[in-house]
């Protein structure tokens, strides 16, 4: 398969939209009509719950598949429901890709040695099964990883990405309020921890730079810290950057585009709750109106990001 960075860059350009929609389902987000339909299909509550999640996700995907280039399911919201939840995740990935969307699995995995190899093969590559063949188990186009175990925890993901045309996004400067507890600490050489991680990501991604000029070894840099995002981009000129923190976490479009390159490329901004629950911000709308509201919000987000790129506040 082609280089992941090239595929994502082309998809963003084709839709003129640097947005990835997060798929982090909760039962409270799902319309009653969907839950009732799922309950009518299955007697097993666990199975009907997973079916409701899948129906909801399909509705969200149908609403925006011609607008956004990618979706980002957060694994925890499916693991929460055990085996049935993981089946819903698998079906969500397959459905999104059937609609022409790239899938970034937000799993934040990492370990060392054989465990890292197993994660990499299971999430991004192929796994050998009993008949001797190798098959793709998860099928995601990319996965988020935690690079704070160092190179030996990342190397298996890089190798699989090189072989399979998949990609990774390493945590560099996260969007959560307490991120600075560790990531802003200063090292003996004067760099902050997140800066050192950015330098490592730049090093790890050198062999996976595609024709687009971007590497399939990307980074996660939150929109909630725009000044650090500008600094991170300087240290990672070739990295694709996944930008959480827009919308429900408080960051606006100006901060969200801080990590983009000078020509407005190289980053993709995530929105989860603000898209999934867009009906909440529209007067007179209910959960039953989620598809139309999500589509409206996705178009509005696209236009705001593009306007912010045309008039940069953080450079």
Residue ranges of predicted features:
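N-terminal glycine-rich anion-binding loop in soluble enzyme alpha/beta folds
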Residues: 2-65, 285
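Short, well-ordered coil/turn segments that N-cap beta-strands
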Residues: 15-19, 66-69, 99-101, 138-141, ...
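Conserved, mostly hydrophobic/aromatic
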Residues: 21, 71, 106, 143, ...
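A C-terminal functional module that forms or caps the active site or interfaces directly
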Residues: 54, 219, 223-270, 274-278
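Acidic (Asp/Glu)-rich catalytic clusters
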Residues: 61-68, 95-98, 158-163, 233-236, ...
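N-terminal active-site wall of soluble small-molecule enzyme domains
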Residues: 67-69, 73-132, 136, 225-228
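Conserved anion-binding
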Residues: 111-217
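C-terminal helical cap(s) of enzyme catalytic domains, especially alpha/beta-barrels
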Residues: 256-262, 277-315
């Amino acid at each position: 398969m082609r280089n992941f960075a090239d595929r994502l860059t082309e998809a963003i350009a084709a839709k003129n939209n640097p947005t990835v929609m997060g798929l982090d389902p909760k039962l409270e987000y799902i319309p009653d009509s969907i839950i009732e339909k799922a309950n009518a299909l299955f007697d097993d509550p666990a199975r009907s719950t997973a079916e409701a999640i899948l129906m909801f996700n399909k509705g969200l995907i149908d609403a925006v598949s011609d607008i956004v280039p990618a979706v980002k399911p957060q694994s925890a919201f499916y693991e929460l429901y055990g085996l049935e939840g993981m089946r819903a995740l698998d079906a969500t990935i397959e459905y999104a890709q059937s609609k022409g969307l790239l899938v970034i699995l937000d799993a934040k995995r990492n370990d060392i040695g054989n465990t890292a190899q197993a994660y990499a093969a299971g999430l991004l590559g192929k796994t050998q099964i009993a008949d001797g063949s190798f098959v793709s188990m998860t099928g995601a186009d990319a996965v988020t990883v935690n690079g704070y175990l160092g190179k030996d925890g990342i190397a298996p993901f890089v190798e699989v990405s090189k072989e399979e045309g998949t990609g990774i996004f390493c945590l560099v400067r996260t969007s959560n309020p307490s991120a600075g507890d560790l990531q802003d600490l200063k090292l003996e050489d004067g760099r902050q921890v997140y800066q050192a991680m950015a330098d490592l990501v730049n090093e790890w991604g050198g062999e996976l730079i595609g024709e687009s000029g971007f590497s399939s070894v990307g980074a996660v840099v939150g929109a909630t810290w725009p000044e650090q995002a500008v600094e991170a981009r300087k240290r990672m000129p070739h990295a694709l950057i996944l930008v959480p923190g827009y919308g429900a976490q408080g960051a606006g479009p100006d901060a969200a585009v801080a990590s983009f390159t000078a020509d407005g490329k190289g980053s993709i901004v995530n929105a989860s709750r603000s898209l999934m629950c867009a009906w909440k911000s529209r007067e007179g709308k209910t959960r039953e109106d989620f598809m139309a509201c999500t589509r409206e919000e996705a178009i509005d987000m696209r236009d705001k990001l593009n306007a912010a790129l045309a008039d940069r506040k953080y450079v």
